[in-house]
Amino acid sequence: MSNHKKDSIVLHFAVVVLLLTSLAARGDEPGCTPSDAPSAQADSTAAKPAEPAPKPEPFAFADFTWLNGNSRQHKPVFDYPAFTGEVRVDTNYVYDLNHPQDHTLVGSSELGRTDEVQLQQLGVGGDFHYDNVRGRLLTQFGMYSTMTPRNDASPARGQWDLANAYRYVSEAYGGYHFDKMNGINVDAGIFMSYVGLFSYYQYDNWAYQPSFVSSNTPWFFNGVRIQIFPNDHFKEEIWLTNGWQSYGMFNDAPGIGTQTLWRPNGNWSILSNDYFYGKDTLNNAGRKRAHSDSSIEWKYRDTPDSKISKSALSFTFDIGCEYGGGVTCTGGTPAKPSQYFIGFMLYDRLWFDHDKYGFTLGGGAINNPGRYLVLMPPINGATAASGTPYFTANPGDPFRAWDASATFDYMPSDSVTFRYELNHRSANVPYWSGPGGVTPPGGNSGAPGSLVSGFQPDLRKAESRFTAAILVKF
């Protein structure tokens, strides 16, 4: 993309933001009166117009705490006029039947170590709201503070070490709420993407390890987001971001996308995330990316006084591709192979004894030739930026995988979940950590991801594991 076209994209988006904010603000300025307003000399005894009814909060018409990816708390613990606090603690233990000697788990954006108790996430912060000004901050301490930046290759371009600058922040943005329609929010910073249905925070989810269409797609975007609520059943988001789950920009163009969410009643939620354009391959400015992610959730049973108090189903389908820069979406050749992502996941959730217990069965599958969304195995310290010769991601390299899981939750209160989960994952190529692990004897050696003389990582085609976790949210 030429600089002229890039400037045009940014300029058009800026014009949209300015138009929306100016239209939303019109009539709200102090001293502004409509042209047909009565004059100051009007009869003071005339009846005053009734105060307009308060607008309903978005999606507050029903209880959506049953949704996968949505907090099940019915009200916040810390709630004050200008601040709603939030504390999250996620601690886990993973027992991997492959027994990697270096205790390193491969292929998960949620878990990284085995046979140890690990703090995955400690988040402290909340939402600030005063006079229509809004902001959100949530910290990111624990395993996430190194795993999440490691999957972002953009800090390798340029200076100031973006991976360290942002590693302790999961969400941080500020913006303004306009009282138009059912609300318009304009925010800038780091915000959750929810491409892939599951939440970044395990407390909100039906399962701990989501399938590939969630685990391999973005958890966050860094940029500008506009949320438009025409009514309390519908939301449209517009994104202008640095790129595909990236702190910085991979090349010379921003990522552009939208989210559409419709909840017609309390039993259905229909979501579509669409990433229309991005140039998200480091050092390959000719390669472009598009991706579509659609989910539907259906609560098909709600009988609070029965043994099964609730039942719900979720289905997610993803399709996307890369084109240009040596690859094509379809109809590839050996010289210019097809490079795409297609996958699905399906989960069924049951609640028992007035929602005190939960049981989830689910899984999914992907096909991702070129491996452009496959998480890089951390062989000899490899990152998304470094890559590794032990597991290539060249155009056309095949990767097909499937997984299944069974999850049992004990939820004695709205603030804690005790979770137990069995997972099995399988791929067409060796990918998961085997008994020999992925770390050279004596630790990482040389540059991240580089070859080590005499060392060969132990990668296997399948993995089965058990996870136990305590998930707390205040």
Q: What is each model feature region?
A:
Residues V89-Y95, L137-F141, A188-M192, I238-N242, ...:
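Transmembrane beta-barrel strands of outer-membrane/channel proteins
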Residues A82-E86, L105, E110-S145:
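Glycine- and aromatic-enriched membrane insertion/assembly motifs of diderm outer-membrane
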Residues V87, L119-F128, E171-Y176, A188, ...:
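Residues on the lipid-exposed face of transmembrane beta-strands in outer-membrane beta-barrel proteins
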Residues F64, N98-G112, T146-Y173, H177-W262, ...:
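Surface-exposed coil loops of outer-membrane beta-barrel proteins
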Residues S2, K6, L19-T104, L451, ...:
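N-terminal periplasmic/intermembrane-space "pro-region" immediately following the signal or transit peptide
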